[in-house]
Regions:
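Iron-associated oxidoreductase/ferritin-like identity signal
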Residues: 1-179
Length: 179
């Protein structure tokens, strides 16, 4: 009976880890689509930062997959939804802030599932990733507010900037101040 209970608890944790992985897979595709579009619109600096955030999401997806495998599960490979394409620059950042806010809320719920089922390792994984998702939210919210408040003036300042992310393969959240 105790072994069956442990397996049931483990399955609940694997389920939330896989749901989180599917959310990350969608975020990767969404942010890379936006990266390409922002670069095409000549907002290189914004495109570069969104690409770095997508790289963070790739790392998160891999971390969730590794934990699923450690628990004896099979990592999912399908994203949790479809990419919203063709967004205008003034819509991208509020959209992404909402996506990150939803992710933070959901991951906090998933963290509780891990705690309730006695998996402190997965709980700590969610805590670490939530911290990075908060950094993403702060960036998207800040840029969205600048675009909202300053409009064309803010965007003109960024137009024509380079989208090169240089030799920074680490992502947005693991580099000092997203630089």
């Amino acid at each position: 009976m105790a072994k069956k209970d442990k397996l049931e608890r483990r399955k609940k944790v694997i389920d939330v880890l896989n749901k989180a992985r599917a959310m990350e897979l969608l975020a990767i595709s969404q942010y890379m689509n936006q990266h390409y579009n922002l670069d095409d619109m000549d907002y290189g600096e914004l495109a570069g930062k969104v690409k770095l955030i997508a790289i963070d999401e790739m790392r998160h997806a891999e971390m969730f997959a590794e934990r699923v495998k450690e628990l004896g599960g099979e990592p999912v490979s399908e994203p949790d939804g479809r990419v919203t394409k063709g967004q205008k620059v003034d819509a991208v950042f509020s959209f992404d802030a909402n996506l990150e806010d939803h992710t933070i809320d959901t991951y906090n719920q998933f963290l509780l599932v891990c705690r309730e089922n006695g998996d402190s390792v997965s709980m700590k994984l969610f805590e670490a990733i939530i911290d990075e998702e908060q950094a993403h939210y702060n960036y998207f919210d800040n840029v969205g507010e600048h675009i909202n408040d300053l409009g064309a003036t803010y965007l003109a300042k960024i137009a024509g900037t380079s989208s090169s992310t240089g030799l920074t393969p680490k992502g947005f959240a693991v580099t000092p101040e997203g630089e």
